[in-house]
A protein has these predicted regions:
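Conserved C-terminal "lid"/linker of ANL adenylate-forming enzymes
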Residues: 495-502, 512-513, 534-581
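Conserved AMP-binding/adenylate-forming
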Residues: 63-109, 233-236, 475
Length: 581
């Protein structure tokens, strides 16, 4: 029965009830199989384990313990990595409620920025209940138009250990969060937040039909089965962690091993250790994670990684240097070039839009070939570090992609433009202060705001459309500049931002680069690095950088999802450089 459903022989899922019933049947087909392992500090040797039956029972039991009587309640969940967090996400869905997991702060997020983002969400997201740690719930009591319920965790996590400063409730002031008015959607399963870094993250309404379609199609492309194991350090408030690393294996009866993001940052070897111990077959990672592991590779060569069929880079764009270094560093531990895979994804389509072909090396296109006709894709050239654009794979079944030029015309192969997508898993709107707001689509097509091109049916993502820097009529992609600067010795790789600064005198933009220095900051060394960066950018990119600023570590602004915020970093740069005084 389960395998028939996976092959698509069973009718599709359209309602919440159908989804939950189908999920229960799938999981109870192997009730004693260990499906979920959650690591809890400090005892990393003994993850908390749940069999399929125990997972279902504990999840529903925990969700029921809050005594939520209102049907289809929107429940905000603000908890750190813990078994309870995974149980709540599943249990609230099974009980017919609509969970929304809010970002828990990591050790690398600026406390003030995090508090501002949290206050904005509490001020603008209609809900019926907030579940969080006891002290924080007490702190918020009276500041929200809905209850804040405290929940103690087995690992004794504390909000105050991370942010002992002013209470969040003081930031709310007298402004009440919007009252709950209606249901996001009759078949909404949960809300997930867009991973954008340009302003407040939006709550995407994910329905039963959207999720079921995504899980079925992605599972088929990856040839996922109940024999597979996913290992992850990605948080549940991010679509990669929530969909690819939790719901996808659950739906297909596969196991998953979940590591806290904070623990992984401190000890990246945990990911490889658990991949080897549990013979993981899939692992999703952003660009910086591949580099982060490669840079520490010499100390992590004792783990056998040959079981992993796919290390999937889910970034826009995929960086050749990131995957190449990872493949080279861990080749002796069983990592094959063909296991390096890629995907293009976003919360607005639940998750994946494209996926590279398993077992085949990533395709690439030399940068010089873009906009040229009759050029063929080749296998990823591992010796051409970032002289190529790397494929994010082909569209999932039933998913369409087209590239649109500025004038609205459809671009031919190899010609870059804005990426538009149409798929059955595409969202219909956001949930916010005004309730459910329908997202306008043009003939069912969603304009992603990303810039890229198609070659031989595969998608190549270049970057964000609005981030392009126009210098003297030439289009400069900031991601290209960042890739060049990341290679400079003394610069913290992955902590570089390029953007445009308006030049009213010349009627164009000037190229600006901000890069964090590796190690302790030194002004003389920073000046030398700035000179090196200017020369390298001019040589490789062919455009002079008007402004180059080498800064101390953690100067660059990141979102709560851990992504560099180009907009906020640019604003900080402009304030520091051009503000009077």
């Amino acid at each position: 029965m389960v395998q028939a459903e996976l092959r698509g022989d069973m009718p599709g899922v359209t309602t919440n009830a159908e989804f939950c019933e189908r999920l229960r049947r799938r999981l109870l087909a192997q009730p004693e199989k260990t499906l979920l392992r959650v690591t809890v500090a400090p005892d990393f040797e003994r993850p908390i384990e749940f069999t399929a039956k125990a997972l279902l029972d504990r999840a529903e039991e925990l969700a029921s313990s809050f005594g939520i009587t209102k049907e289809r309640s929107v429940v905000l969940v603000l908890l750190p990595h813990s078994p309870e967090l995974f149980l709540l996400q599943l249990g609230l869905v099974l009980k017919g409620h609509i969970p929304a997991i809010l970002a828990w702060p990591t050790s690398r997020v600026d406390p003030e920025k995090y508090k501002c983002n949290l206050v904005h969400q509490l001020n603008h997201l209609p809900a019926d209940l907030l579940i969080t740690l006891p002290r924080l719930a007490e702190n918020l009591a009276g500041s929200l138009p809905y209850p804040a319920c405290g929940m103690s965790l087995a690992n004794g996590a504390s909000f105050e250990k991370i942010f002992p400063a002013a209470p969040v409730s003081e930031r709310l002031g007298n402004r009440k969060s919007p009252k709950r008015n209606g249901c996001p959607n009759p078949d909404a399963l949960f809300l997930q937040f867009s991973g954008g870094t340009t302003g407040a993250q939006k709550a995407v309404v994910v329905t039963a039909g959207m999720l079921a379609h995504q899980l079925k199609q992605l599972g088929e492309v990856l040839q996922l089965s109940d024999a597979d194991v996913v290992v992850s350090w990605l948080p549940l408030y991010h679509d990669m962690g929530l969909i690819a690393c939790y719901w996808l294996p659950l739906w297909h009866g596969a196991a998953s091993v979940q590591i806290a993001a904070n623990d992984w940052v401190i000890n990246p070897e945990l990911l490889l250790k658990y991949a080897a111990r549990y013979k993981a077959t899939f692992c999703w990672l952003p660009n910086f994670s591949f580099s982060y592991l490669s840079q520490r590779g010499e100390q992590m060569q004792k783990h056998s990684l040959g079981s992993v069929r796919a290390w999937i880079n889910c970034s826009e764009p995929v960086r050749c240097k990131s995957v190449a270094e990872f493949a080279t560093t861990f080749a002796g531990r069983g990592v094959k070039k063909e296991s390096l895979q890629a995907s293009y994804a976003m919360a607005e389509t639940v998750f994946a839009i494209t996926q590279s072909e398993p077992g085949r090396e990533l395709a690439s296109v030399p940068r010089s070939c873009v906009s040229h006709e009759n050029r063929a894709c080749g296998e990823l050239a591992f010796d051409l570090i970032d002289d190529v654009y790397v494929s994010s794979g082909k569209p999932l079944p039933d998913t369409e992609i087209k590239i649109i030029a500025v004038d609205g015309s459809k671009c031919p192969d190899f010609a870059p433009g804005e990426i538009h997508v149409r798929t059955p898993s595409l969202f219909s709107g956001y949930w916010g202060a005004e309730g459910f707001q329908t997202h306008s689509l043009n003939g069912g097509w969603h304009a992603t705001g990303d810039f890229g091109f198609i070659a031989e049916g595969e998608l190549f993502v270049i970057g964000r459309f609005k981030d392009i820097v126009i210098v003297g009529g030439n289009n400069i992609f900031p991601e290209d500049v960042e890739a060049v600067v990341n290679s400079v010795a003394g610069i913290h790789a992955g902590r570089v931002v390029a953007f445009g600064v308006e030049d009213q005198e010349f009627g164009t933009q000037g190229l600006a680069v901000v890069a964090e220095m590796k190690g302790e900051f030194n002004e003389d060394a920073a000046l030398q690095l700035e000179t090196t960066i200017r020369k390298l950018v001019l040589t490789v990119i062919g455009t002079a950088a008007r402004y180059v600023s080498v800064v101390p570590q953690r100067w660059i602004v990141k979102s709560t999802a851990g992504k560099i915020s180009r907009r906020e970093t640019r604003e900080r740069f402009l304030r520091d450089r051009f503000s009077p005084g």
